[in-house]
Amino acid sequence: VFQALKAKGILVGIASGRARYGVPQEVQNLHADYCVKLNGAYVKDDAKNIIFQAPIPADVVVAYKKWADDMGIYYGMAGRHEAVLSTRNDMISKAIDNVYAQLEVCPDYNEHHDVYQMWTFEDKGDSLHLPAELAEHLRLVRWHDNSSDVVLKGTSKALGVSKVVEHLGLKPENILVFGDELNDLELFDYAGISIAMGISHPLLQEKADYITKTVEEDGILYALEELGLIDKELQFPQLDLENHTGPKVTIKTNHGDMTLVLFPEHAPKTVANFLGLAKEGYYDGIIFH
């Protein structure tokens, strides 16, 4: 899909809540023109030039850690090149290991590195709220029964994508996006065309301009073909023409009879096309040009 789009001069990008080191290698190998990571806090192009970055202020990180410790909440921190945990237990492992495997424990990580995103690890669910002094700077985005992303207020996938759009001198109406989760809501509000995957959050589907098939059904490819951004590859069935019982037409030519097997799904006007070509002079009595 990426190569087909690039061949038409269309730039492609990936916007994710994850950092690059949490993205599967096969996705990295696609070489997207732009990558919006960590819910919009870090944006790079394929040449690894930084387009935009918004680390969480150091004093806000310290204040968050103190609040988490006071509340008995475990936490994690995501930097530019790695992420770490405040501790390790079964609850944390079940939440984070499918996204970032084998993270080290380093509660003092922020003392020597910029932090772009943090996490809570707890069993409080949607009842968890930041205190007012932290809520001025941070917001929680629940993504797991036992964890929320803790992101800088104002950052989002939409912000990161907008920085790419500004960098390219484009406008939001020049952008088409796909999404499936709640952290895509702001992105759907921003982009000119928004497409929800087949099994996506109901709130996201309400905002979508178009709902495609599921990931397993190649929903992205399907939507791009339907919109004409990628040429649809026609799949003609291989048939035993001698024994085929479907519709056929025979055209008399100077070189003998030409028998065509008709596939209504792909070429319902085959005969009309041949007649039209003949009438318009593309048939000189010997061959079609």
Q: PLM features: residue spans?
A:
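Cyclophilin-like peptidyl-prolyl cis-trans isomerases
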Residues: 232-289
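Phosphate- and divalent-cation-binding pockets in alpha/beta enzyme and binding domains
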Residues: 21-25, 129, 160, 186-187, ...
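Active-site phosphate-binding/coordination module
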Residues: 1-92
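Short, acidic/turn-prone active-site loops that include or flank metal/cofactor-
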Residues: 39-42, 144-148, 199-202, 216-220
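Short hydrophobic/aromatic-enriched beta-strand-loop microsegments
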Residues: 32-40, 54, 95-97, 140-142, ...
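Conserved acidic, metal-coordinating active-site core of Asp-based
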Residues: 67, 71-190
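Acidic, Mg2+-coordinating phosphoryl-transfer loop and its flanking beta/alpha structural elements
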Residues: 16, 161, 171-215
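Short, structured coil segments at secondary-structure junctions
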Residues: 30-31, 39, 133-137, 190-191, ...
